[in-house]
């Protein structure tokens, strides 16, 4: 393993572009962004080709649903970015910024209670893309879960959205009217949605 020969300033600069140093070398791992982990077949082929052409041939998936391509030489970073840009792919997702938004598969999952793809894509556009020039004190993570099963762990993020079923409460139903005790205890006003 060769030692790191580039300056700390250059290392910091490319980290801001989504390239993390592979310990003790002049090689980097590129964080290729996805929206909710969704990529087209053509984008997948492009990343696989880029991994073989510029890196060590491996694709790794991060907890924030980005794709990491390891082993890219420092002097090939710009060429790598141009190569993946042909399929609309970009690198990023590092530093003290809003991180890529993650969501579960709630849109298509049998337990999903909301359209987690659409909501997280809107949040991604507004906050990840919209706040890229905003310096934060620390990384800021957002997750969207389609139901309380907690697959994507929204509660472990800085902002977590969890789909919930909204019960329909009918206080004056025939059953409630027959049960005076229930009628006394169910005194609530629900907002209209």
What residue spans do the PLM features occupy?
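Intrinsically disordered, low-complexity polar/charged tails and linkers
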Residues: 1-25
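Small-residue-enriched alpha-helical segments and adjacent helix-cap loops
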Residues: 4-6, 30-170, 175, 179
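Iron-sulfur cluster-binding cysteine motifs and their immediate structural context
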Residues: 179-193
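Short, ordered beta-strand-loop transition motifs
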Residues: 22-26, 166-170, 186
């Amino acid at each position: 393993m060769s030692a790191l020969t580039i300056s700390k300033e250059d290392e910091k600069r490319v980290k801001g572009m989504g390239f993390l140093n592979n310990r003790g070398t002049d090689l980097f791992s590129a964080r290729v962004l996805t929206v909710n982990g969704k990529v087209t077949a053509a984008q997948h082929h492009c990343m696989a080709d880029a991994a073989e052409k510029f890196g060590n041939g491996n694709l790794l998936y991060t907890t924030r649903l980005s794709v990491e391509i390891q082993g890219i030489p420092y002097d090939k970073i710009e060429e790598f970015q141009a190569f993946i840009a042909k399929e609309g792919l970009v690198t990023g997702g590092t530093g003290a910024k809003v991180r890529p938004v993650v969501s579960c598969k709630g849109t298509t999952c049998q337990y999903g209670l909301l359209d987690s793809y659409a909501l997280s894509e809107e949040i991604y556009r507004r906050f990840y893309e919209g706040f890229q020039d905003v310096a934060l004190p620390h990384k800021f993570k957002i997750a969207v879960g389609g139901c309380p099963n907690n697959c994507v762990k929204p509660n472990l993020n800085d902002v977590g959205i969890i789909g919930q079923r909204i019960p329909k409460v009918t206080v004056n139903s025939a059953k409630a009217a027959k049960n005076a005790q229930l009628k006394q205890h169910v005194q609530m006003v629900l907002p209209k949605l």
